[in-house]
Design a protein with these regions (language model features):
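Intrinsically disordered, low-complexity terminal regulatory regions
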Residues: 1-134, 148, 157, 170, ...
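Short acidic/polar capping segments at secondary-structure boundaries
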Residues: 162-164, 178, 197-198
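A short beta-strand signature within small-molecule sensing/ligand-binding domains used
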Residues: 168-177
């Protein structure tokens, strides 16, 4: 089923934004035993702690690791390149330019390779370094859906102030890892970024289903090649 991002906003209630922001301040200050941290979702709190121990800055822009021709060559050779049409069809049906979300596909190292979707939102997310070639791994920018999904090997939803990097607090995101259908090694990650609608239950189901569809299509393509 293709996405309809304006439909559902049924994300489960979390601790208030103010409480999360205060807890984040305490963690950045090194107060890992502060009681406010216990009010933060365990998945988020544990990711914050990993980020803090890795000395990730709470406001730094991500590093651009792939640019121009190097990025083009890497994308062309990446195993997820052949899946982009399917990802667009499932997550950006209709007019992507006014979809209300940004869809990103990255490699297993957390580097973003393709970023598509709502043109107005993309002009805003560009400002925080959410661009093709940038490293959004957890150990580079802290807690985010794509980076933490790769770290944990499972789909992840991060809402607003749950992000480790303050530059990302205006945004919410859901991401799911993609694995090689035979070796089960990580190949990359699929992410949707936008407002609260992208951290709904429906959004997680759609992103998970898209990742599984990509894996299935890869396996079918390989079996066809072997049969020829």
């Amino acid at each position: 089923m293709a996405a309809s991002w304006n439909a559902s906003r049924d994300a489960p209630p979390e601790a208030s934004r103010l409480l999360i922001e205060r807890a984040h301040e305490e963690l950045i200050a090194g107060n890992l035993d502060d009681r406010r941290l216990q009010q933060v979702r365990p998945l988020v709190r544990e990711s914050w702690e990993r980020s803090w121990r890795s000395r990730v800055g709470p406001e730094g822009a991500p590093q651009l690791e792939l640019v121009s021709e190097e990025l083009d060559r890497y994308r062309l050779a990446h195993p997820l390149a052949s899946a982009m049409d399917m990802i667009r069809a499932l997550l950006l049906p209709g007019s992507a330019e006014d979809s209300g979300v940004v869809v990103a596909v990255g490699d297993r190292a957390g580097r973003l390779l393709w970023i598509e979707g709502d043109s107005q939102l993309r002009s805003l997310t560009d400002g925080m370094g959410f661009v093709a070639g940038a490293n959004w791994a957890e150990d580079a920018v802290g807690t985010t859906a794509p980076g933490t999904a790769l770290t944990l090997g499972q789909s992840v939803q991060i809402r607003g102030a749950e992000h480790y990097n303050r530059l990302v607090h205006p945004w919410s995101c859901t991401a799911a890892p993609v694995r090689d259908p035979e070796t089960h090694q990580l190949l990359g990650v699929i992410d949707i970024t936008g407002g609260d609608e992208v951290v709904s239950r429906q959004a997680r189901l759609l992103v998970d289903a898209t990742a599984r569809a990509v894996e299935s299509e890869m396996l079918v393509a390989r079996l066809r090649e072997r049969a020829d």
